[in-house]
Amino acid sequence: YCGLFGDLCTLDGTLACCIALELECIPLNDFVGICL
């Protein structure tokens, strides 16, 4: 599974965004971010 647009992600990569959709994990704090 990979995170879709608007999904949460973790900065350590355990919850990653879909690279194939060119989504990046934009940090919200020191631990989590959002796929945009």
Swiss-Prot record:
Positions of disulphide bridges: C2-C18, C9-C25, C17-C35
Keywords: Disulfide bond, Knottin
Taxonomy, superkingdom: Eukaryota
Biological role: Sialidase inhibitor. Competitively inhibits bacterial sialidases, but not viral sialidases. Does not inhibit glycosidases or proteases. Has no antitumor activity.
Record note on domains: The presence of a 'disulfide through disulfide knot' structurally defines this protein as a knottin.
Protein's name in the database: Asteropin-A
Organism, as annotated: Asteropus simplex
